[in-house]
Amino acid sequence: MDDAHSTDASLMARMAQRDPKALDMFYTRHARAVFSLALTMLGEHTRATDLAQDVFLLVWRSAGTYQPTGSARAWLLRLTRNRAIDELRRDRRRLANESTLPEQLFQALPAPLALADAAERQAVRDALAALPAEQRDALFLAFFQGLSHQEIATCLRTPLGTIKARIRRALQTLRQQLQGEPGT
Amino acid sequence: MAAPLSCDYCEELLADYLLHALEPEAVNEVTEHLSTCERCRTQLTTYEAVLDQLAQAVPQQEPPAELGSRLLAAAVEGSMLTASVPESLPLHRRPTWRPRWVFLLTAANVVLCLGMGWWTWHVQREAALVHQRWQEVQRHLALQRQAFTLISAPETRPVVLRSDKPESPAHGILLLKPEEPNAVLIVQDLPPLQRDRTYQLWLGLGGSQRDNGGVFRVDEQGFGLMRITAPRPFTAYQRVGITEEPAGGSPGPTTPRVIGAPLQGS
């Protein structure tokens, strides 16, 4: 089987055997998605590039421990998001004071406006567009900026319980819209 | 010891669990519950799928062309270090030719001195770059602070600027107080320009009369932010538009507008 037709799991297995061609193929297949998510979350080209490299290097180094239990792309993006959140939280700890939080919030909000411009992402775009704005904003701040619920509550000057409920409702609605949950 | 979670309560916590928004103690409780509850594990999977879709729905951007080769070089280098270091250090190697050993030591000293000089120069250069970057960040933060103040003001009016071409993703928002000449412009998805080009904001009066609203550039992602001090209050203007112009700006627009919006009623 040539590289182009290899499954992600077989590429991971070859990476565990230190086959650079497998890494090259895996990178070619997923680099765009990883870089795009990193860029959306970090907002800086250089940082997103470094983070993408870190993620693929981590995959390369720990390929031997990979357990194929679902889509490798989804797993890779979870890894990317976790690393980006670590960075964002480090930034916030460095800048932690009352006056900077609203600025970060302000910086965070434009990203959702540009979300999902490709045709194949239409369903996600529609589902997001249908969410009430306050739910969408809270979900974006939690998901793409890694803000804790307490930080979102402080930024939006909204009670913590309300923020939790908004995020939960947003996810429930998205789940219903995207997965056609029975009874909806 | 805390009582085990009920399924209803666990399901309530699942979204927070996936968003890493739970306290460590609650994370442990949910993890423990999930290890024994098939139903909640299924619920978790469905939420996980939604978040996965969200992660894949971001605007897609090509990574820099050199990233692939950089990654491969780092991976191969890392592998060689791990694999070859033990082999490259023979256990019983002894110096066999003393004059060569002395020569190598001298050469190493010269390299070290040169290296120290280079390192000092490099650190000084880095410090200057960091200082410059810090000043840029401060300027940017001041601008954002003003934008946030404007957003929070009850009398602020947002004006959305769009392209005349429906397929263009370029858009912007102008935050203004109609009775005042100050405003903040935020744009997204405008094509980045060459060094000798710039974007220019036009504030249209009646007919073909217009004021210059200022020039700005956008970053690699097409994002830009500009503070505006117009020659008159915004009630005087009927429309706004942005065009691409030579660096430094033009006395009047020389290209079709990229995005714009009417201001009537402000």
Give the ranges of each region predicted by the language model.
Chain A
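Sigma70-family region 2
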Residues: 16-17, 40-45, 54-71, 90-91, ...
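Amphipathic, Lys/Arg- and hydrophobic-enriched alpha-helical face
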Residues: 27-45, 62, 128, 173, ...
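Structural recognition of an alpha-helix C-terminal capping motif at a helix-to-coil junction
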Residues: 50-57, 70-82
